[in-house]
Amino acid sequence: MPRVSILLTCYNHIKYLPIAFQSILDQTFQDYEIIALDDGSTDGTRQWLESQNHPRLKLIFNESNLGTYGTLNVGLQAAQGEYIAVFNDDDVWLPTKLEQQIALLDSNPQIGLVHTDGYFIDGEGQERHDSPLGFDFPRTETGDILLALIYANSIIASAVLARRECFDQLGGFNPGYFGSGDWEMWYRIAEHWQVGYLAEPLTLYRVHGANASHKLDRIWRDDLKLRTWISPRIDSYKNRFPESELTRARAHNLACLGTVQALTGDPQSARSSYRESLRFDPTRWKSRARILATYLPQKLFRKLL
């Protein structure tokens, strides 16, 4: 039985798939299985995968296009490893990624997942020195990072190695999400386990024109669902974090909820969320300004953000 199951999600990235696959083969830690999950690609991905002669490669082809998280759940059902790695077919791992993550997990049973530092690359594999998705490569400390995950998704999916036990206890990914299901999954894990972080850049996230992260309308719908789901959970953390930290986190989550409500065409609910955010933190001047902005046409509100 392999120690690591690598869930290699594939969808119409044949240009990048061989590079991603080779970065798996180049890992210094070799006790793994590769479960290649093709979600209905039409660009030759299936044929390329079928041509690979690797004894630890399992192929699962889905013709109905389940989406990222439904596809990952199929992979979880097939996985036999003690640890689960998620790897997108357009990203790249550096050779010691799995080795270092295994060492951290083996020595810290309280850690449920460990992620690494990294950087963004372009379609040609060159490092990006800007913030192409509007944020820096996500980083955390090792420890209890649950509140940090309220502020933003601080974990890149391809940077993660998680215990299979986490998925066995909490269930798999929520297939109702388009692009934020990994954020929701890491959040659920962080509610019950600590999160480990390796400060070495071992994961390269490729940014190109076909990234799902560019489909903003669907991402905003995801954020609306996620922020609504998080709000009632915060009260249950009262014995875990200082009240001042919880108050700021509540205010932030409500302000973010207000913004995605406005972005998705519900300005009345947005104003209510912004006002509730200000009740917890009256110093949030952006929330005051955005209450006024919700009275503007939706297209203008989007431009003002």
Where are these regions (language model features)?
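N-proximal low-complexity "stem/linker" segments adjacent to membrane-targeting elements
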Residues: 1-25
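Glycine-rich, basic loop-to-helix element that forms the pyrophosphate-binding segment
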Residues: 62-79, 89, 100, 144-146
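Conserved donor NDP-sugar-binding/catalytic core segment of glycosyltransferases
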Residues: 96-129
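C-terminal subregions of glycosyltransferases and related glycan-biosynthesis enzymes
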Residues: 207-305
